[in-house]
Amino acid sequence: MSDWSLSQLFASLHEDIQLRLGTARKAFQHPGAKGDASEGVWIEMLDTYLPKRYQAANAFVVDSLGNFSDQIDVVVFDRQYSPFIFKFNEQIIVPAESVYAVFEAKQSASADLVAYAQRKVASVRRLHRTSLPIPHAGGTYPAKPLIPILGGLLTFESDWSPALGMSFDKALNGDLSDGRLDMGCVASHGHFYFNNIDSKFNFEHGNKPATAFLFRLIAQLQFSGTVPMIDIDAYGKWLAN
Protein backbone atom coordinates (compact mmCIF):
# COMPACT_ATOMS: atom_id res chain seq x y z
CA MET A 1 0.00 0.00 0.00
CA SER A 2 1.34 3.42 -0.98
CA ASP A 3 2.27 6.02 1.62
CA TRP A 4 0.96 8.84 -0.59
CA SER A 5 -1.86 11.04 0.72
CA LEU A 6 -4.06 12.84 -1.80
CA SER A 7 -5.26 15.21 0.90
CA GLN A 8 -1.67 16.09 1.77
CA LEU A 9 -0.80 16.66 -1.89
CA PHE A 10 -3.68 19.12 -2.28
CA ALA A 11 -2.71 20.87 0.95
CA SER A 12 0.90 21.13 -0.19
CA LEU A 13 -0.12 22.77 -3.46
CA HIS A 14 -2.11 25.44 -1.63
CA GLU A 15 0.59 25.98 1.00
CA ASP A 16 3.21 26.47 -1.72
CA ILE A 17 1.09 29.13 -3.47
CA GLN A 18 0.24 30.89 -0.21
CA LEU A 19 3.88 30.88 0.92
CA ARG A 20 5.13 32.32 -2.37
CA LEU A 21 2.45 35.01 -2.43
CA GLY A 22 3.30 35.91 1.16
CA THR A 23 6.99 36.08 0.32
CA ALA A 24 6.27 38.44 -2.59
CA ARG A 25 4.28 40.67 -0.25
CA LYS A 26 7.08 40.86 2.33
CA ALA A 27 10.17 40.83 0.12
CA PHE A 28 9.30 43.59 -2.36
CA GLN A 29 8.67 47.16 -1.26
CA HIS A 30 7.96 48.63 -4.70
CA PRO A 31 4.27 48.11 -5.60
CA GLY A 32 5.11 47.29 -9.22
CA ALA A 33 7.68 44.65 -8.29
CA LYS A 34 5.34 43.22 -5.68
CA GLY A 35 2.53 43.00 -8.23
CA ASP A 36 4.72 41.40 -10.87
CA ALA A 37 5.90 38.76 -8.39
CA SER A 38 2.34 37.91 -7.34
CA GLU A 39 1.20 37.74 -10.94
CA GLY A 40 4.08 35.39 -11.71
CA VAL A 41 3.05 32.99 -8.94
CA TRP A 42 -0.47 32.62 -10.35
CA ILE A 43 0.74 32.28 -13.95
CA GLU A 44 3.22 29.58 -12.98
CA MET A 45 0.54 27.67 -11.05
CA LEU A 46 -1.86 27.72 -14.00
CA ASP A 47 0.83 26.83 -16.54
CA THR A 48 1.92 23.92 -14.35
CA TYR A 49 -1.45 22.40 -13.48
CA LEU A 50 -3.82 23.26 -16.34
CA PRO A 51 -3.90 20.77 -19.24
CA LYS A 52 -1.28 21.60 -21.87
CA ARG A 53 -3.87 22.76 -24.40
CA TYR A 54 -4.06 25.91 -22.25
CA GLN A 55 -1.41 28.55 -21.67
CA ALA A 56 -1.38 31.37 -19.12
CA ALA A 57 0.44 34.68 -19.60
CA ASN A 58 0.31 38.41 -19.04
CA ALA A 59 -1.07 39.66 -22.35
CA PHE A 60 -3.13 42.05 -24.42
CA VAL A 61 -6.11 40.72 -26.38
CA VAL A 62 -6.89 41.92 -29.92
CA ASP A 63 -9.83 41.41 -32.27
CA SER A 64 -10.06 41.29 -36.08
CA LEU A 65 -11.40 44.87 -36.14
CA GLY A 66 -8.13 46.13 -34.68
CA ASN A 67 -9.41 46.78 -31.16
CA PHE A 68 -7.19 46.00 -28.17
CA SER A 69 -8.06 45.19 -24.58
CA ASP A 70 -6.34 46.67 -21.55
CA GLN A 71 -3.23 44.79 -20.46
CA ILE A 72 -4.43 41.73 -18.55
CA ASP A 73 -2.44 40.22 -15.67
CA VAL A 74 -3.38 36.61 -16.42
CA VAL A 75 -4.89 35.45 -19.71
CA VAL A 76 -5.73 31.76 -20.13
CA PHE A 77 -5.80 31.03 -23.85
CA ASP A 78 -5.83 28.14 -26.28
CA ARG A 79 -2.46 26.97 -27.54
CA GLN A 80 -3.58 23.85 -29.38
CA TYR A 81 -5.90 25.36 -31.98
CA SER A 82 -4.79 29.01 -32.01
CA PRO A 83 -3.14 29.65 -35.39
CA PHE A 84 -1.11 32.60 -34.14
CA ILE A 85 0.01 34.36 -30.97
CA PHE A 86 1.96 37.61 -31.39
CA LYS A 87 5.02 38.36 -29.29
CA PHE A 88 6.71 41.75 -29.60
CA ASN A 89 9.36 43.09 -27.21
CA GLU A 90 8.26 40.59 -24.54
CA GLN A 91 4.61 41.67 -24.92
CA ILE A 92 2.17 38.88 -25.80
CA ILE A 93 -0.90 39.65 -27.92
CA VAL A 94 -3.62 37.00 -28.15
CA PRO A 95 -6.53 36.94 -30.65
CA ALA A 96 -9.87 37.32 -28.88
CA GLU A 97 -11.17 34.01 -30.25
CA SER A 98 -8.43 32.11 -28.40
CA VAL A 99 -9.24 33.40 -24.91
CA TYR A 100 -10.86 31.19 -22.26
CA ALA A 101 -10.40 33.30 -19.13
CA VAL A 102 -8.89 36.56 -17.86
CA PHE A 103 -7.87 37.45 -14.31
CA GLU A 104 -6.60 40.49 -12.48
CA ALA A 105 -3.88 39.45 -9.99
CA LYS A 106 -2.95 41.76 -7.13
CA GLN A 107 -1.88 41.61 -3.48
CA SER A 108 -5.13 42.46 -1.69
CA ALA A 109 -8.81 42.63 -2.63
CA SER A 110 -10.64 45.93 -2.14
CA ALA A 111 -13.64 47.76 -3.60
CA ASP A 112 -11.38 49.78 -5.90
CA LEU A 113 -9.56 46.66 -7.08
CA VAL A 114 -12.80 44.79 -7.78
CA ALA A 115 -14.06 47.71 -9.89
CA TYR A 116 -10.69 47.89 -11.66
CA ALA A 117 -10.77 44.15 -12.39
CA GLN A 118 -14.31 44.45 -13.72
CA ARG A 119 -13.21 47.14 -16.17
CA LYS A 120 -10.29 44.98 -17.30
CA VAL A 121 -12.52 41.95 -17.86
CA ALA A 122 -15.08 44.05 -19.74
CA SER A 123 -12.35 45.35 -22.07
CA VAL A 124 -11.83 41.75 -23.24
CA ARG A 125 -15.45 40.62 -23.41
CA ARG A 126 -16.42 43.62 -25.56
CA LEU A 127 -14.00 42.64 -28.31
CA HIS A 128 -15.35 41.20 -31.56
CA ARG A 129 -14.90 37.45 -32.04
CA THR A 130 -15.28 35.44 -35.24
CA SER A 131 -16.43 31.83 -35.69
CA LEU A 132 -16.31 29.96 -39.00
CA PRO A 133 -18.12 26.78 -40.13
CA ILE A 134 -15.96 23.72 -39.56
CA PRO A 135 -15.09 21.67 -42.68
CA HIS A 136 -15.28 17.87 -42.61
CA ALA A 137 -15.23 15.05 -45.18
CA GLY A 138 -18.95 15.36 -45.93
CA GLY A 139 -19.24 19.15 -45.94
CA THR A 140 -19.21 21.59 -43.05
CA TYR A 141 -20.48 21.76 -39.50
CA PRO A 142 -22.19 25.00 -38.43
CA ALA A 143 -20.00 27.65 -36.85
CA LYS A 144 -19.39 26.92 -33.17
CA PRO A 145 -21.16 29.30 -30.77
CA LEU A 146 -18.77 31.66 -29.00
CA ILE A 147 -17.76 30.39 -25.58
CA PRO A 148 -18.27 32.67 -22.56
CA ILE A 149 -14.99 34.25 -21.45
CA LEU A 150 -14.47 33.68 -17.74
CA GLY A 151 -13.35 36.65 -15.66
CA GLY A 152 -11.91 36.77 -12.17
CA LEU A 153 -9.71 38.17 -9.42
CA LEU A 154 -6.68 36.59 -7.74
CA THR A 155 -5.18 37.98 -4.52
CA PHE A 156 -3.25 36.95 -1.45
CA GLU A 157 -5.20 39.02 1.09
CA SER A 158 -8.35 41.11 1.49
CA ASP A 159 -8.71 44.65 2.84
CA TRP A 160 -12.10 43.72 4.31
CA SER A 161 -12.93 42.12 7.63
CA PRO A 162 -14.37 39.59 7.27
CA ALA A 163 -12.33 38.93 4.16
CA LEU A 164 -15.15 37.28 2.21
CA GLY A 165 -18.17 39.10 3.61
CA MET A 166 -20.95 41.44 2.57
CA SER A 167 -18.60 44.22 1.46
CA PHE A 168 -16.87 41.90 -1.00
CA ASP A 169 -20.25 40.64 -2.23
CA LYS A 170 -21.49 44.22 -2.74
CA ALA A 171 -18.41 45.11 -4.77
CA LEU A 172 -18.75 42.01 -6.96
CA ASN A 173 -22.41 42.83 -7.64
CA GLY A 174 -21.37 46.26 -8.92
CA ASP A 175 -21.09 44.84 -12.45
CA LEU A 176 -23.01 41.73 -13.47
CA SER A 177 -22.74 42.30 -17.21
CA ASP A 178 -19.54 42.56 -19.28
CA GLY A 179 -17.38 43.06 -16.20
CA ARG A 180 -18.76 40.25 -14.07
CA LEU A 181 -16.09 38.37 -12.10
CA ASP A 182 -17.12 34.72 -12.36
CA MET A 183 -14.59 33.35 -9.89
CA GLY A 184 -11.55 34.20 -7.87
CA CYS A 185 -9.28 33.37 -4.97
CA VAL A 186 -8.12 35.19 -1.85
CA ALA A 187 -5.39 32.71 -1.01
CA SER A 188 -5.24 33.47 2.73
CA HIS A 189 -8.98 33.06 3.25
CA GLY A 190 -10.96 31.27 0.55
CA HIS A 191 -12.37 31.49 -2.95
CA PHE A 192 -15.57 32.70 -4.61
CA TYR A 193 -17.64 31.96 -7.69
CA PHE A 194 -20.84 33.14 -9.34
CA ASN A 195 -23.63 30.58 -9.03
CA ASN A 196 -25.60 30.77 -12.28
CA ILE A 197 -28.50 28.76 -10.86
CA ASP A 198 -29.12 31.15 -7.95
CA SER A 199 -27.67 34.21 -9.74
CA LYS A 200 -25.53 35.11 -6.75
CA PHE A 201 -21.96 34.87 -5.53
CA ASN A 202 -20.94 31.98 -3.30
CA PHE A 203 -18.00 32.30 -0.93
CA GLU A 204 -16.06 29.24 0.24
CA HIS A 205 -13.93 29.87 3.33
CA GLY A 206 -10.63 28.09 3.94
CA ASN A 207 -10.30 24.52 2.69
CA LYS A 208 -7.09 24.98 0.68
CA PRO A 209 -8.31 27.99 -1.35
CA ALA A 210 -5.70 27.98 -4.13
CA THR A 211 -6.26 24.29 -4.85
CA ALA A 212 -10.04 24.66 -4.64
CA PHE A 213 -9.94 27.60 -7.06
CA LEU A 214 -7.74 25.65 -9.49
CA PHE A 215 -10.16 22.71 -9.51
CA ARG A 216 -13.15 24.98 -10.06
CA LEU A 217 -11.40 26.69 -12.97
CA ILE A 218 -10.53 23.35 -14.57
CA ALA A 219 -14.15 22.23 -14.22
CA GLN A 220 -15.38 25.44 -15.87
CA LEU A 221 -12.89 25.06 -18.71
CA GLN A 222 -14.13 21.52 -19.31
CA PHE A 223 -17.63 22.90 -19.86
CA SER A 224 -16.26 25.56 -22.22
CA GLY A 225 -15.04 22.96 -24.70
CA THR A 226 -12.80 24.24 -27.48
CA VAL A 227 -12.51 27.73 -28.89
CA PRO A 228 -14.26 28.52 -32.22
CA MET A 229 -12.57 28.25 -35.61
CA ILE A 230 -10.98 31.67 -36.08
CA ASP A 231 -11.47 33.65 -39.30
CA ILE A 232 -7.85 34.17 -40.33
CA ASP A 233 -8.86 36.26 -43.35
CA ALA A 234 -10.54 38.79 -41.06
CA TYR A 235 -7.15 39.39 -39.44
CA GLY A 236 -5.27 39.07 -42.73
CA LYS A 237 -7.00 42.11 -44.21
CA TRP A 238 -4.80 44.27 -41.95
CA LEU A 239 -1.79 43.22 -44.05
CA ALA A 240 -2.98 45.63 -46.73
CA ASN A 241 -3.15 48.62 -44.35
Swiss-Prot record:
UniProt keyword annotations, A-Z: Antiviral defense, Endonuclease, Hydrolase, Magnesium, Metal-binding, Nuclease, Nucleotide-binding
Activity regulation summary: Activated by cAAA and to a lesser extent cAA and cAAG; cAAA and cAA are products of its cognate CD-NTase. Cyclic nucleotide binding causes hexamerization. Cyclic nucleotide binding causes a series of shifts that enclose the cAAA molecule, enable hexamer formation and juxtapose pairs of active sites to allow dsDNA cleavage.
UniProt record, GO biological process: defense response to virus
Required cofactor(s): Mg(2+)
Site (Binds cAAA) residue list: R53, Y81, T226
Any one GO MF annotation of this record: metal ion binding
Catalytic center residues: D73, E104, K106
Residues annotated as binding Mg(2+): D73, E104
Entry EC no(s): 3.1.-.-
Effect of Y81A: Loss of endonuclease activity
Signal peptide coordinates: none
Nucleotide-binding among keywords: yes
Annotated site location: Gate loop latch: H136, Y141
Oligomer and partners: Self-oligomerizes. Forms homotrimers; in the presence of cAAA the trimers associate face-to-face to form homohexamers. The 2 cAAA-binding sites are on the exterior of the hexamer at the three-way junction, there are maximally 2 cyclic nucleotides per hexamer.
Protein family: Belongs to the NucC endonuclease family.
Described purpose of this protein according to its UniProt entry: Effector DNase of a CBASS antivirus system. CBASS (cyclic oligonucleotide-based antiphage signaling system) provides immunity against bacteriophage. The CD-NTase protein synthesizes cyclic nucleotides in response to infection; these serve as specific second messenger signals. The signals activate a diverse range of effectors, leading to bacterial cell death and thus abortive phage infection. A type III-C(AAA) CBASS system. A cyclic nucleotide-activated dsDNase. In the presence of 3',3',3'-cyclic AMP-AMP-AMP (cAAA), and to a lesser extent 3',3',3'-cyclic AMP-AMP-GMP (cAAG) and cyclic-di-AMP (c-di-AMP), endonucleolytically degrades dsDNA. Binds one cAAA in a pocket on one surface of the trimer; cAAA binding promotes hexamerization, which is necessary for nuclease activation. Also binds c-diAMP or linear di-AMP with lower affinity. The nuclease digests dsDNA to about 50 bp lengths with a 2-base 3' overhang and a consensus recognition site of 5'-Axx|T-3'.
Name used for this protein in its record: Endodeoxyribonuclease NucC
Taxonomic classification: Bacteria, Pseudomonadati, Pseudomonadota, Gammaproteobacteria, Enterobacterales
Gene that this sequence comes from: nucC
